[in-house]
Amino acid sequence: MQTFLQVAHIDKICDNKCIKFGRSVMGFLSEYNSKLTSAEAAVKCVKSGDWVEYTSNLGFPAACDLALSKRRDELKGVKIRGDLIFGPIQVIECDPDMEHFVYNTWHCSGYERKMCDRGRAFFEPMVFRNLAWYYKNFLTSDVCMVTVSGMDDEGYFYFGPSLGMSKCIADNSKIVIVEVNRSIPRIKGSEEARIHISEVDYIVETGDPPLFEMPNPAPTETDVKIANLLLPYIKDGACVQLGIGGMPNALGELIADSDLKDLGMHTELCSDGYLAMFKAGKLTNAKKTLHNGKGVLGIAIGSHEFNEWLTDNPAYVGYPLSYVNDPYVISQNDNMVSINACIGADLYGQISSESSGTRQISGTGGQLDFVCGAQMSNGGKAFICMSSTHTDKSGVMHSRIVPTFSGDIITTPRSLAFYIATEYGVVNLAGLTTWERADAMISIAHPDFRDELIKAAEANRIWLPSNKR
C-alpha cells in the first residue's frame, strides 16, 4: 500500500509530464519505490566507528537521527557531523557519556552551543568556502543523511535551504540516505542544488512535517541606531550581503522604507530581511555585475512566507558555499556591501565573532570570506557591527571593545579589519596605524569605558599624547 500511494503521489506531481518523458518517469518511480524504506531499516547501514553526516539546518534528518539513537547499544564510536541544527539531536540526548555517539558541529546553533557547554558536543573549526576541499582531500564520510524535497519528474530531489554544503558531502560519502519532506522549498540554480535518484541509496518518507521557522527577533533600539548609521553607506545598485539577527533585520526594514533602488543580493545566508527588501521593490538584482538579474544564496533560514518566496523562484538561485563564499567570486560584484555582526573587538582591530573566551558561541562561517571579497570588490565595503556594551547575568555592564583579547577566538584578524560600527559611530580601520586604530575604536566605545580604554592604550604603547581625550 505504501508503494502504491507513493507512485500515485509522484504521478500527480508529474501530471501530464509523464507523457513527455515516457518510460523515464516510470523508471524513476520504479527506482524510487525500490529504494523506499523505513528510517529504522536505512540506518542499519551504520557501523561502529563510522563517520555520519547530518548536513545543515533544515537538512537535518530527524527521522534517521531518532532511528540511529535507538541503535545506541549496538554501536560504538560513531562520529556525527552537523551544522546549525536547532535540536534536539537524539544521538546526543541518548548518550550523555558519548560512548556510542560523538557529535561535532561546523557552526553552533543555540542548542548545539548548550551541548558544547556541557561537554556533550564538539566544534569543528572551518571557513565555509573550504568545506568541499576538506571532504575531497581529508575527511572520511561513510554515511550521509539529509532531508530533501519531493522528487521531481526528472528524478531530482532538491536540498532547499541546506544546499550550500549538502551536495559535496553526499558526493564524498559512501552511502546516501535522503529523508523526503515535501515542505522543503525547491531552491534552484547550480547542479549542486539537487541530487539525482541514481545517486541515492535509501529513501525515507517523513510525513512532511512543517519546517522550523527562524524567529525574527525584534530589533533593539541599539540595532536600529546602528542600522541608521550604515544606511548612508549603501548606494543605488549596491550588492548586499546581510548576516542574521536583529541588526540585519532592522537594516533590511530600513532599506525597504528608503529611497534606495536596484539593490542586488549575493549572500551566504538568505533570510527574511531580503524578503522585506524585495516586497518593497528595492531588491531587483538589475545592476549586478555577476549573475545579473539573479540573487545568489548558499543557505536559507526564514519564515513560511520566506520559504514560499524562494520555492521555484528563477530569480533567486542557490550555489555551493565553495562558490558563494569564494572571495574572488564575491569581488566580481561591484559595490559589494558586506554587513555582519561580532561579539567583540579590541583596540588593535582584531574581531571575535564566534566565541566568548574559549566558549564557542557560533562559528567562523563566511565572515572572513566576505570581508576579503568586499575589499577586493570595485567600490566594496565590509562592515562588522556590535552594540558597544553587553550586560552579564549579574546586571553588570561590560564594554564589547576591549584593550586586547585574552583567550577569545579571532575570526577576522586586524590586518583585514575594515569598517567597524557601534551605536556611537562607524570607523574605517583600513590602513591605520596601531595608535590610529586605538583612537578610532575608543571613539565608538561606550562613553563610560573610554577613559579606561585610553589608560590601557597608553600602557600598551599604542596611544599618542596628542590624541584627543
Show the residue positions of the predicted features:
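Conserved alpha/beta enzyme-core scaffold
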Residues: 15-16, 21-469
